[in-house]
Amino acid sequence: MQDVERLINEPVGCPGALNTFWHGELGDAWTAPRFVPYHDGEVPDDACGRQVNDPRQFADNALYCTLDDTVAYSVDFLDELAQVGGPTYPLFVLMHELSHRGDRIGGNLGVVTRAEENQADCFAGRQASAAHDAGRIAVRDALQGALLFYSLGDTRGGWFAQEPASAPDAHGSPRQRAQAFALGYLRDSSTCHTIGRSETGDVSF
């Protein structure tokens, strides 16, 4: 778990670090992110928490807050993920949220909500690939990301089929999320941008 924390916090130039990856994508436009941990039953101490002020909206969650450029996460949620899949599971969730930050800094937003979420899953795969190439995480752990995002895909009693790709909370289906992560891991950033341009939120090549 300590190496996972180092991957998140190490400065630009450290092999496999997430800041190194994003600096390679965005140059000096990328700055070290600010993380805001909180517990279920609380609201994060950031602009999104102050605006909503309803702990239920933040339970078992992690999010990038565009209002003040922060990444907030429930410590309880990430601890639960670590118990299920080991320390890389929470790492992949934070990679996903950092992808939203990178997309906004780079001006590469998805055309609809579901496409934007799938694009973030894809860039989580890109970051996992960079960390593996630097010898920071094992290939087995990296590919576990596809299983994680499959488990986090939208099912919710047919919700995926009932809501349009532009719905505010739309994410990819289990298959789409796993496929997006795997494509990011195996291919390149242009693949992720292609996913972000899908008006239906589909992930197919």
Per-segment meaning from a language model:
Residues 71-74, 101, 122:
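Structural recognition of the beta-strand scaffold that forms the well-ordered cores
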Residues 12-15, 25-26, 121-158:
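Short helix/loop segments within enzyme catalytic domains
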Residues 98-114, 126-133:
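Catalytic Zn2+-binding segment of zinc metalloproteases
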Residues 40-72:
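Catalytic zinc-binding patch centered on the HExxH motif and its immediate surroundings
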Residues 75-92, 109-114:
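Short pre-active-site segment immediately N-terminal to the catalytic Zn-binding motif
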Residues 159-205:
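Pan-zinc metallopeptidase signature
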Residues 89-97, 101:
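Short alpha-helical catalytic segment bearing the HExxH-like zincin motif
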Residues 1-50, 187, 191-197:
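A metal-dependent hydrolase signature that marks the N-terminal structural subdomain at the beginning
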